[in-house]
Amino acid sequence: MAGSSAATSCARFLALLATCLLWNEAASFTASGWNKAFATFYGGSDASGTMGGACGYGDLYSTGYGTNTAALSTVLFNDGASCGQCYRIMCDYQADRRFCISGTSVTITATNLCPPNYALPNDAGGWCNPPRQHFDMAEPAWLKIGVYVGGIVPVMYQRVPCAKQGGVRFTINGRDYFELVLVSNVGGVGSIQSVSIKGSRTGWMAMSRNWGVNWQSNAYLDGQSLSFKVTSSDGQTLTFLDVAPAGWTFGQTFSTSQQFS
């Protein structure tokens, strides 16, 4: 009996330990290993040419992303699934001592696509062609790691957790029977796997990715308070209840106090 009881207690402990380990793995995104790529820059000295972009964040100043941003090559962009991810980038000084700034790094957020240019070779202008891993960085961010006249430099990069101030934000655009919701200021892993929406008179409804970080619903939700359920690309799910009051209008942005880790 004593042996059986001890075995049962041990099994329960191991099950609890496994649960805790799995929870910790899902609960906090950690930095990846280092990889090699190349980086160029665009958008001008004030990064005004980086506004908008294929992720749909719009004005990067007002949405909190600033000038530490980059457009990702086709492979890294992953049809928009990488929007919002954060990368620490440093120039590979050992590979290019002439144009690399040694001992510095910059953390950027993915906000745009660097489109392929199949008219040019991959190593002579077609920098963002598959299968290249490439960052076309906002000029102010690039100048923290590279010398302007270099134009293109070899880099080392790693995925890192996104550190954000405040909670996740929801901007509601569209029209009747077409809600287009921009989900921004996402911390932790930074990118989103799925979004669901719920009106005060409906159940939960899955949204579809329209483009970038804009998620679409075709329900009629006017006059209802809105709640959202967001799952990040590393499997964390947060529920944001009554984010928008019943009197919301298209074009409004609503901030929350909840954030991914």
UniProtKB/Swiss-Prot annotation:
GO BP terms in the entry: plant-type cell wall loosening
Record localization: Secreted, Cell wall; Membrane
SUPFAM superfamilies (alphabetical): Barwin-like endoglucanases (SSF50685), PHL pollen allergen (SSF49590)
Signal peptide range: 1-28
CDD domains registered for this protein in UniProt: DPBB_EXPA_N (cd22274)
Record bears the keyword Magnesium: no
GO cellular component: extracellular region; membrane
Record domain Expansin-like EG45: where: 52-167
Keyword Lipid metabolism: no
Domain of life: Eukaryota
Alphabetical UniProt keywords: Cell wall, Cell wall biogenesis/degradation, Disulfide bond, Membrane, Secreted, Signal
Gene3D superfamilies assigned: Expansin, cellulose-binding-like domain, RlpA-like domain
Residues annotated as domain Expansin-like CBD: 177-256
Membrane topology: Peripheral membrane protein
Tissue occurrence: Expressed in adventitious root primordia, coleoptiles, shoot apex, leaf primordia, panicles and flowers.
InterPro entries: Expan_Lol_pI, Expansin, Expansin/allergen_DPBB_dom, Expansin_CBD, Expansin_CBD_sf, RlpA-like_DPBB, RlpA-like_sf
Protein role: May cause loosening and extension of plant cell walls by disrupting non-covalent bonding between cellulose microfibrils and matrix glucans. No enzymatic activity has been found. May be required for rapid internodal elongation in deepwater rice during submergence.
PANTHER family per UniProt: EXPANSIN-A15
Similarity-based family: Belongs to the expansin family. Expansin A subfamily.
Protein name per its UniProtKB record: Expansin-A1
Organism in which the protein naturally occurs: Oryza sativa subsp. japonica
Organism lineage: Eukaryota, Viridiplantae, Streptophyta, Embryophyta, Tracheophyta
